[in-house]
C-alpha cells in the first residue's frame, strides 16, 4: 500500500500508549546485578501509539483509541498525538491509574530487556469502545496489538 492509498482510508488504531524510559549500558544486568548505565532518554511509545504515529506521518487519516493516566506522561502523549495530526477524540484519560511506562535497557549490541507497567492501558474497557462506535463503523482498517 503506497502513501496515496493510505491517505484515502480511515484508519483506526486500538492499542497501548506508553512512555519509554531507555537507558544504554555496556551489557544487560544479570539477576541481582546492579550496573552503571550511560545515556538515558524518554520517548513516546507503546505498540499502538507507534502505529498511529507512523500512519499519520505517512499522511494517513488515523484515529487512536487508548487510555492514559491523567498524569504528565498522559498529557505529553496527548500533545504528541495532536501535533502529529492524529484524531484524539477517543484517547481516554483515567484519573485512577498512571499512564503506561516501559523501562528499557539496551546494551552495546542493541539487545534489550523491557519491563512494561501497563497502567491505564489495562483499563481500556468495552464501555470505552462503545463510545467510539461511530469511528469503528467508519474505519476502513482497524489495527490492534497484543501488548
Model-derived segments and their meaning:
Residues 2-17, 75, 79-93, 97, ...:
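Ribokinase/PfkB-type carbohydrate-kinase core domain
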Residues 51, 99-102:
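Residue-level marker for the onset of beta-strands and adjacent loop->beta junctions
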Amino acid at each position: 500500500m503506497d502513501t496515496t492509498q493510505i491517505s484515502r482510508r480511515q484508519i483506526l488504531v486500538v492499542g497501548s500508549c506508553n512512555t519509554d524510559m531507555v537507558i544504554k549500558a555496556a551489557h544487560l544486568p544479570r539477576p541481582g546485578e546492579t550496573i552503571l548505565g550511560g545515556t538515558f532518554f524518554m520517548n513516546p511509545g507503546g505498540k499502538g501509539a507507534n502505529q498511529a504515529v507512523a500512519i499519520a506521518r505517512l499522511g494517513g487519516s488515523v484515529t487512536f483509541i487508548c487510555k492514559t493516566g491523567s498524569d504528565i506522561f498522559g498529557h505529553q502523549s496527548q500533545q504528541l498525538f495532536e501535533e502529529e495530526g492524529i484524531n484524539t477524540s477517543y484517547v481516554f484519560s483515567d484519573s485512577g491509574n498512571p499512564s503506561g511506562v516501559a523501562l528499557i535497557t539496551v546494551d552495546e549490541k542493541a539487545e534489550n530487556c523491557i519491563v512494561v507497567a501497563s497502567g491505564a492501558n489495562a483499563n481500556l474497557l468495552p464501555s470505552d469502545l462503545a463510545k467510539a462506535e461511530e469511528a469503528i463503523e467508519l474505519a476502513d482498517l482497524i489495527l490492534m496489538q497484543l501488548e
